[in-house]
Amino acid sequence: MAEIQAWRRGFSKMGLKPTQYRCASEALLRRFRQEGSLPRLHPLVDLCNAISIAFAIPVAVFDLSKISGNIEVRHASGSESYLTFSGEVEHPEAREVIFADAAGQAHARRWTNRQSGLSAMRDDTHSVLIVAEALHGSAASDVPKLIDTIAAELAAIWSIEVRQGVLSSSSPRFDLSSAMNLQLQQKQD
């Protein structure tokens, strides 16, 4: 699959073994192929996992209340903290590509390989950031389709308003504070 091959090339360029560290969508596809199903985690995560499999594009769901300030994809300094799902604290290696916030928390390691237990979706989560990334040739048209699919499903299932955007080198920011303000307004109404 072109979508997976592009991530494997990207991981190789980062110095990672692409069959040891797989992007999230490849890991989901492998698990689904081997087991015939995926574990049920949370309705929103299950929905995003199904869409990730359908598009072969990694999708992550972050609990916005666990993110300090903005989140950015960048190289680690090595001082960031990453909370595993088992509760252990790790420190990403310097130059590793991570999702980091203003407090030095790493919310994902090895770019799209592993999400942090800190910002994982839980039953008490009220506001989320859903991120989809792709590197393959038709990513510029496939990612907006994936985002539209998620937005349509969220509106149909939960009747919620979704703010969405596509980031690029010419438009590298998505204002999380506006997304949080929208969520707060919805809770107050």
Where are these regions (language model features)?
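RNA/tRNA-interacting regions in translation and RNA-turnover enzymes
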Residues: 1-189
